[in-house]
Amino acid sequence: MAVEQDIFDAVVMADERFHGEGYQEGYEEGSSLGIVEGKRYGMVHGAKIGSEIGCYRGFALAWKCLLHSGAGEKDSRKMKVVEALIALLQDFPYDDPTYEKLHEDLDRIRGKFRQLCSLLNVQPDFKVTPGGSGLAF
């Protein structure tokens, strides 16, 4: 009689056993795919932020050179904003993706960039496209 119960237990418990094995296999495969997908997402997102920051830096350095040559009273305010933007860009943590205030600093840089564009009467249109990124005026 005990042998008959063991046979039926194996049949009855097969569903639970297969469920557990399937869950474990799915969990392992999902974990490895999640790491790959997360890495790919991080690379793409990081490249977009890097492209945006690089564009702001080039814009600020170009205007610094242009404003330096014509150092008038109006240009001194513009020059202060340019230098403030450059300082924000230099302090940006390029090598630390775990930096807690990354998005706050990025928003501050974007705000300073918009302020500079307003002072310069420039309407920027920053776009990241598959062909590259940049500003359009």
UniProtKB/Swiss-Prot annotation:
Main function: The complex LTO1:YAE1 functions as a target specific adapter that probably recruits apo-ABCE1 to the cytosolic iron-sulfur protein assembly (CIA) complex machinery. May be required for biogenesis of the large ribosomal subunit and initiation of translation. May play a role in the regulation of proline metabolism and ROS production.
User: What interactions and quaternary structure are annotated?
Assistant: Forms a complex with YAE1. Interacts with PYCR1 and PYCR2.
Kindly list the positions at which N-acetylalanine occurs in this protein: A2
Q: Where in the cell is it found?
A: Nucleus
Please list the disulfide bridges: none
Q: Which organism is it from?
A: Mus musculus
Q: What is this protein's name?
A: Protein LTO1 homolog
In which broad location class does this protein mainly occur, judging by the first location in its UniProt entry?
Answer: nucleus
